[in-house]
Each structure stands twice: as structure tokens, then as C-alpha cells.
Amino acid sequence: MLGEKSDFTIHPINVLQDNIVWVWVHNCNAVVVDPSISGPVEKWLLEKNLSLKAILQTHHHDDHIGGTQKLIKTWPEAKVVASKKEHKRIPFQTFSVDDNDIFNLMDAEIKVIEVHGHTDNHIAFYISKQNAKCNILFPGDTLFGGGCGRLLEGSPVQMFESLYKLNSLPENTEIYPAHEYTESNLKWALSLEPGNISIIERLKLIQKKLQKGMSSLPSTLSEERKTNLFLIAENVEKFTMLRKHKDRWKC
């Protein structure tokens, strides 16, 4: 949530195997991030009597854009915000953005951050509001709880640089990734650093949450700096080694 007294709230809709569609609500309006499928999202919005104002697309993969076209049939005035470099792969975008663009939506300022690595032209959305207790990051598949996205199109150098960009944000930034991978990521990290108290404590905490049917997310940048081995890798060589190890690792 953006600030203790804010009327902004963010809600998870769990879909498919491990995707999370985040819904950002302000008064009677909503913004949806990376809708994998339309059904559960449309149902949730209609039950809450919310008007869909925009859809934020971080990248072109079907488990992130699969529900968009059906949602804009129900709410034709909703903007579809996506990278202007992805017109071919996200052809239904109606509000095209580029790296470092800033636009306003639902009484907040949103900055676009280009984060190559998982895919070319992947973007993240950084949301700030004056006098808010914290700011918010929707990183798509770039940054996860305790992890980062696989390198499907980009290089280790690109992902390392993208994580460096995100790591430069304020430490109280709340992070809303598009997948629930935190437990697996922390188990992997613990296999490399079995004595890391921060990872041990975080893993215990999120396992309790998951057992209660809760989400492990959002996390904070402060928390990721203590427990995310990818984010704190000292150099590209270390990052590359970690990414290759994680790609081969079995939980």
C-alpha cells in the first residue's frame, strides 16, 4: 500500500500455476498489472464495482498479456501501457512509453525503467506519491522475491545492469513481482549460503505465510538487499555464475 493513510491499495489475484496479477485500486478505479488471463480479473473488478483505467504491461510473454484484449473489450476506455519498442509483440498497446518516461495515473507519478535481461525491452513501473510512506515497484519478471528472471533474450551483463538500476531505488520501495517464487528462490540461496541468518529467517517467515494461504509478497528493497544473492552480486562474473547455478538447480 502507498502510505499508511493512503487510499491506494494493491491486491493480488493468483492465476495459472504461480502468476500474480496485481490490482492497484484508488477510490473506484483500478489499474491491472500483467493480466495473464481475463476471467478472474474481470470477476474481481466487477464484484468490487471498480472501473478499469489502465493495464500496465512489463513485457510480451503470454502469461503477462494473455488477458488484456478481453479486458479492454469490457473496459474499452482503459489504456494499455507498454514499451513503444514492443509494438509488434504487444500490438494492442494504446499508450506507448520509453525508458525514463514519467506519466501520471490515479493521482500518482509513474516512472518507466527499462530493464533488459529476461526479455529485450522489458520495462518496470516505479510508482511514487507525495508524502507516501513507501513507493512501489512492479518489476514484472526482472526481480523476484529472493531471485531474478531467467535470461531468455538478454545477456548476463544486461540483467546485472537492470538489477543495478532497481537496486538504486529507495530501500523502503515495496516490490510486487509477477510470480510467487520466493520460497524456491530462498531455498536455492540457502543451499549456497547455509549459514546466512537473514535468508534463514526470511524463509521461515514466508513459509509460515504460505502455509496460511497468504502470499510471500510484496517484499521491500531493503529485504532483498539482505537475502537476494542476484541483487547483491558484486560483479557480472559473480552474477553469471549464480544465474547458471540457479538454472541447473532442482528444489
UniProtKB/Swiss-Prot annotation:
Pfam families linked to this entry: HAGH_C, Lactamase_B
Domain of life, per lineage: Bacteria
Gene Ontology biological-process annotations: methylglyoxal catabolic process to D-lactate via S-lactoyl-glutathione
Catalytic activity: an S-(2-hydroxyacyl)glutathione + H2O = a 2-hydroxy carboxylate + glutathione + H(+)
Residues given in the record as Zn(2+) 1 binding sites: 59, 61, 118, 141
Binding site for Zn(2+) 2: 63-64, 141, 179
GO molecular function annotation: hydroxyacylglutathione hydrolase activity; metal ion binding
Pathway connected to this protein: Secondary metabolite metabolism; methylglyoxal degradation; (R)-lactate from methylglyoxal: step 2/2
Top-level EC class as recorded in UniProt: hydrolase
Needed cofactors: Zn(2+)
Gene3D superfamilies, alphabetized: Ribonuclease Z/Hydroxyacylglutathione hydrolase-like
Membrane-crossing segments per the record: none
InterPro entries in the record: Clx_II_MBL (IPR035680), Glyoxalase_II_hydrolase (IPR050110), HAGH_C (IPR032282), Hydroxyacylglutathione_Hdrlase (IPR017782), Metallo-B-lactamas (IPR001279), RibonucZ/Hydroxyglut_hydro (IPR036866)
Keyword set, alphabetical order: Hydrolase, Metal-binding, Zinc
Enzyme Commission no: 3.1.2.6
Cofactor comment text: Binds 2 Zn(2+) ions per subunit.
HAMAP family, A to Z: Glyoxalase_2
Subunit structure comment from the entry: Monomer.
Protein role: Thiolesterase that catalyzes the hydrolysis of S-D-lactoyl-glutathione to form glutathione and D-lactic acid.
Family matches, as NCBIfam families: GSH_gloB
Family to which the UniProt record says this protein belongs: Belongs to the metallo-beta-lactamase superfamily. Glyoxalase II family.
This protein's name: Hydroxyacylglutathione hydrolase
